[in-house]
A protein has these predicted regions:
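Surface-exposed binding/hinge segments that line
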Residues: 6, 93, 125-191
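N-terminal lobe/hinge region of extracytoplasmic solute-binding protein
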Residues: 33-86, 122, 129, 208-210
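A structural "hinge/loop" feature
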Residues: 37-53, 77, 104-107, 172-184, ...
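Aromatic- and charge-enriched surface segment that lines or borders ligand/interaction sites
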Residues: 79-131, 164, 256, 303
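Structural transition elements
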Residues: 333-366, 383-391
Length: 538
């Protein structure tokens, strides 16, 4: 797939030239070695960090944002906001003089205003909205996984620069939710213009936002080019050009970083970290991960509808060995679906120990004394929560073999993997999550909630009423201490039911060349280059 803002298609010669070699950073150009291709360029459709990094982070804004490096909420396209005493009405005062990007097919005639907020939200929320089903086969996955239709009653335009969200119920994480990627603000004028021209789908393919960088061109699995947006409301970026060199293999990313072919790289191999730290040209930033790596069992498929089978496979998995071999010790074994750095983490929960004999007993009790066969899907790309999906799968395969469970290892190209998982084709699947907003709700609801079964984000396809009631009640509870008690109970239910094997919480590392200035690791595993500069070389 080749797309460009100049003419709708990238000339083949230019595409090949871009793919063949990305020169060492020219003045004002930063090259980031990313780990994979985005699934598309519409931030409302997708849920992966790879796509967010390439789309919503550089090119879009939300009403509120997270301060880089933290999950503190700061003004974005809304300058200020107020909430009613009952927690059900939020009023946002919008920022004026915010410009939208342009491309060869669209030049905005007005600034951002309330119409764009209503358009962006109602497109997701209203099944009858003219742009709701614009792109065939695409759904608003995050919006649906979070059950936002059950939370927001209506969005109203008070005036051109004031919007009011009325909720159906109090929702403690609502502001944090509004800072997430799915809540990016689109240009209503752009979509309507493309509709009038008879090419409405192009608005979902060629992105127009208000962010720090404008889209330039894209060649699938090779390169994305952006340019600094001169009219960015929060100050023009210091670099002129941003290039994503899509490099799936972590070893190849490291090689490019060493030679200066890129200045920042995604997700290094843990085994390379010691060598990186000795290189005087490199700097390594690290942060405890707001994440979880896990194996989900599809409870809609036998034998995973049987809790004893799920518990047995938990007992059969040597997570300490995985932490050592896959993570090189850079993290900790997980026992809960949320990381220990997140408030409400229940440290009293007892994990399943590595106990093959007990696992074998449970399998016999479940009616499988000789084990069974299954497919174990493993990640095809490096993720912040899992540096080597194939190696992890091989270790788990060997563990399960000891109790008679024969696992066939399966994977697909990343977008295809996601698509098939969303459709529930898998039996057992390797996945993970990096928190988006610093609230426990952001783990429990989109990963384990009943609405997320419909949306496809709940890979276990597990809908448990006791768990669901606790999580919903927690979201409606204003005091954090009271919410924490409910989430702690939910973790007990989760552990007993065992829809996942909770594998590990990783430490994250961002390697960069020392000429990169002003880069700050993000708490949610995104990569922001808005405030980055490159030191002048002699």
């Amino acid at each position: 797939m080749n797309i460009s803002i100049r003419n709708g298609m990238m000339a083949a010669g230019l595409a090949l030239a871009c793919a063949a070699a990305i020169p060492a950073a020219a003045k004002g150009t930063l090259v980031y070695c990313s780990e994979g291709s985005p699934e598309g360029f519409q931030p409302q459709f997708f849920t992966t960090g790879t796509t967010f990094d390439a789309v919503s982070v550089p090119m879009f804004n939300r009403l509120v944002e997270f301060e880089t490096g933290t999950t503190n909420i700061i003004p974005g396209l809304a300058e200020s906001w107020t909430a009613s005493a009952d927690g059900k009405v939020y009023t946002f005062k919008l920022r004026k003089n915010v410009k939208f990007h342009s491309n060869a097919n669209f030049k905005p005639s007005r600034d951002f205003n309330a119409d764009d907020v209503l358009f962006s939200w109602n497109r997701m929320a209203d099944d009858n909205h003219p742009f709701h089903k614009l792109t065939a086969g695409q759904t608003f996955a995050y919006f649906e996984d979070m059950g936002m239709k059950n939370i927001v009653d209506k969005v109203e335009k008070v005036d051109d620069y004031t919007v009011r969200f009325t909720l159906k119920r109090p929702e403690a994480p609502f502001l944090a939710d509004m800072a997430m990627d799915f809540a990016s603000i689109l240009s209503m004028e752009y979509f309507e213009t493309m509709m009038k021209r008879g090419t409405p789908n192009s608005a979902d393919v060629y992105p127009i936002g208000t962010g720090a960088f404008e889209f330039g061109s894209y060649q699938k699995d090779a390169i994305i080019r952006y340019k600094a947006f001169d009219k960015y409301w929060n100050g023009r970026p210091k670099i002129d050009n941003l290039v994503y060199a899509i490099t799936r293999d972590a070893t190849a990313r490291y090689a490019k970083l060493k030679t200066g072919e890129c200045q920042v790289m995604a997700f290094p191999k843990p085994a390379d970290l010691d060598e990186m730290k000795k290189d005087p040209a490199l700097a390594i930033q690290q942060k405890e991960g707001l994440n979880i790596g896990y194996i989900a069992f599809n409870v809609e498929k036998k034998p995973f509808d049987n809790k004893l089978v799920r518990q047995a496979l938990n007992l059969a998995t040597n997570k300490d060995a995985i932490l050592k071999a896959v993570y090189q010790g850079n993290g900790q074994v997980a026992k809960n679906p949320i990381p220990p750095i997140l408030w409400s983490y229940n440290n009293a929960v007892q994990d399943y120990p590595y106990d093959p004999a007990k696992a074998k007993q449970l399998l016999t009790q479940a009616g499988f004394p000789n084990g069974f066969e299954l497919e174990l899907w493993y990640l095809p790309v490096t993720r912040p929560y899992n540096p080597d999906g194939k190696r992890m799968a091989e270790l788990i395969q060997a563990d399960w073999e000891k109790i008679g469970v024969k696992a066939k290892l399966v994977t697909y190209e990343w977008a295809e993997y996601r698509k098939r998982a969303k459709g529930g084709e898998h039996q057992a699947i390797m996945f993970g999550w990096s928190g988006d907003n610093g609230d426990p709700d952001n783990f429990f609801v989109p990963l384990l909630g009943c609405e997320a079964v419909k949306g496809g984000g709940n890979n276990a396809r597990w809908c448990n009423k006791q768990f669901e009631d606790l999580v919903i009640k927690a979201a409606q509870t204003p005091k954090q201490a009271d919410r924490a008690k409910l989430y702690e109970q939910a973790q007990v239910v989760f552990k007993e039911e065992a829809p996942w094997i909770t594998v590990a919480h990783s430490i994250r590392f961002d390697p960069l060349r020392k000429e990169v200035q002003g880069y700050k690791m993000d708490a949610t595993a995104h990569h922001y280059f808005n405030n980055v500069d490159l030191a002048k070389t002699p």
